Amino acid sequence: MRTAGRLAVACWLALACAAGAPARGADLSELKVLYVGSERKSDYVEFLEGQVARVEARSRKAFRPEEARDFDVVLLDWPQGEETREMRTLRSPLGARADWGRPTVLLGSAGLNLAVCWKLKGGSGCTCLDPLAYDLRDHEIFERPHRIDRGRMIAIPTPKDFRDELEEPEIRVLPLVDDRETRRMPGWCTHALDFARYPDVEFFCGGVNSQTPTSAALWRQGNLLHFGFQESPSEMNENGRRLLLNAIAYISRFTEDRPIAVTPSVFAGPVARSRSTPARWLRHGELRIDSIKDVVSPETWAEIEGAGDREAMARRADELARFLHPNAEQILEVDPDLVALGVAFDDPAFFDRTLADLRSSDPAVAGRAGRLLRRYAPEGPGGADADAWTRWRDENRPYLFASDAGDYRWYVDPLAKRRGVPSAELRGPGRADR
């Protein structure tokens, strides 16, 4: 009787755990995973059975966000196709960005589609990713729970589209499939030149693609992990399947972090380029002048063009870059208020200068400072006086960072502020649950 009683209690506890709240920071075998999609439901469910504690699937079109409540990780499978053709009108199957807190792996083009809907990083790149991982960083995602065998990396000729930036005749890549010569649906890779400035973003690896060697294939923003490779588990080799499992395990630990920056996508409408774009494009010999001319205002272009040859123009564009700002048409132009201030909006001295000017007895100087603060620090106290702005700056100084990816503004890092850790020090795995 006692044995039967103990067995009954054990069974009850097992059922309670299976039906209860998500297991934060759990091992892979303890995780409850929900696949949201339609196209590859059987493949993912069959693969994950036996790997995780529980796996279920929901149709993407019928999915309700509250259905994810009892799961540790959601896999969103949302390919490009007829459903996503009108990207300006896309609606997220996960609901509103502000309401979604579940750790999520974005499979293939789900990273693009959700980025367009939610204005995330990931909305600029190309559907051109091959199943060849490149530039693997020294990161735990390649070690736990399964060690990725870097000894299986191979050398291939440097892709044509990488040669402008890489001088080496060969690069080393990790194949995620065995038959790498077979043509497949390409995955989604994201332009990643500015990733290092964002506290909530970490880059794990790139992949062979038809744009740049710096593009990201596997990376994280907040509680969202982008697994850009399009291949299903049944198409992958052992390293590919292990990498997918490691991605699920890693993102399960990020229930507190969230994407911070609001980054509009070029696929949803006009977006201002970053300030470095004109100079960078001028130094790219194959880009036509007209393409570069189109991203800046006529007045700004006249100043750049007057510098002389292409390299001289690039140098002048570099000089102007710190004062560039998008106008209402999302074209870059010189901000006269920044020129008068004498520093870029993302310069650490920006707040010291503007706050000093806000106390000026000259109405023109104080008015300019107020405009700059409202324009570049929209989370601040708006039209408040210098004392209120100074208190806000002092309260948030350790947690501030700036972005010019279409947004051109300062942000407060909410996780860093909540934990009382400077944003510059709270990066990568340090943002996982404690």
Predicted segments, located by residue:
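Extracellular ligand-binding/catalytic regions of CAZymes and related secreted enzymes
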Residues: 26-29, 197-329, 406
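Helical hinge/lid and interdomain linker segments adjacent to catalytic or ligand-binding clefts
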Residues: 30-116
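An acidic, glycine-rich "communication" segment
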Residues: 106-202
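Boundary at the C-terminal end of the N-terminal hydrophobic targeting segment
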Residues: 20-25
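Positively charged n-region of N-terminal signal peptides that target proteins for export
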Residues: 1-6
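Bacterial N-terminal signal peptides
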Residues: 8-18
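Long, helix-rich interaction regions
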Residues: 129-137, 145, 289-434
